């Protein structure tokens, strides 16, 4: 969103690194050219599953040799009982941060069939199938995970 890009721009204004912040619809064709690093924070989970392979291939193709993708996503557990427990933990966390049960319920309903999480294995397989030579999990907390993928 423009507001998120503005905050990112403010946070990076003194950075000596070269960067480009882009607002795009990932369900459409994404043009990435000559990138050293691509970061997707809680983004791919909103891309329709049938479009995720082409999104990953576009990212892979747009990275320079040795480039990397940092992917952080909401994930679902391979074990349904754990998945439900993790979701409940997350709702408790939101309540502790001041959200009401109604707000939590409304957000969950709004994201139903829009946010479609995959398992850690499904995400890893997606990255491997796109051509990344190295894929590793660098972060996992309940139903959230971070991956690093190297070209």
Please provide the spans of the model-predicted regions.
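C-terminal alpha-helical "lid/dimerization" subdomain adjacent to the S-adenosyl-L-methionine
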Residues: 74-130
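A short glycine-rich, Lys/Arg-flanked "PGG" loop and its adjoining helix->strand segment in the class I
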Residues: 53-65
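Conserved beta-strand signature within the Rossmann-like core of class I S-adenosyl-L-methionine
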Residues: 66-74
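Core SAM-dependent methyltransferase catalytic element
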Residues: 124-151
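Short catalytic micro-motifs in class I SAM-dependent methyltransferases
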Residues: 42-45, 73
């Amino acid at each position: 969103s423009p507001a998120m890009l503005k905050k990112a721009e403010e946070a990076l204004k003194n950075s000596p690194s070269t960067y480009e912040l882009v607002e795009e619809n990932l369900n459409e064709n994404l043009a990435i050219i000559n990138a050293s690093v691509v970061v997707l924070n809680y983004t791919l989970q909103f891309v329709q599953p049938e479009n995720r392979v082409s999104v990953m291939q576009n990212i892979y193709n747009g990275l320079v040799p040795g480039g990397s993708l940092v992917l952080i996503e909401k994930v679902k557990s391979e074990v349904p009982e754990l998945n439900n427990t993790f979701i409940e933990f997350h709702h408790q966390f939101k309540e502790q941060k001041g959200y009401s049960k109604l707000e939590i319920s409304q957000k969950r309903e709004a994201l139903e069939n829009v946010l479609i999480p995959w398992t850690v294995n499904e995400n890893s397989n997606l990255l491997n199938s796109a051509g990344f030579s190295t894929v590793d999990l660098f972060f996992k907390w309940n139903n959230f995970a971070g991956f690093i993928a190297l070209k």
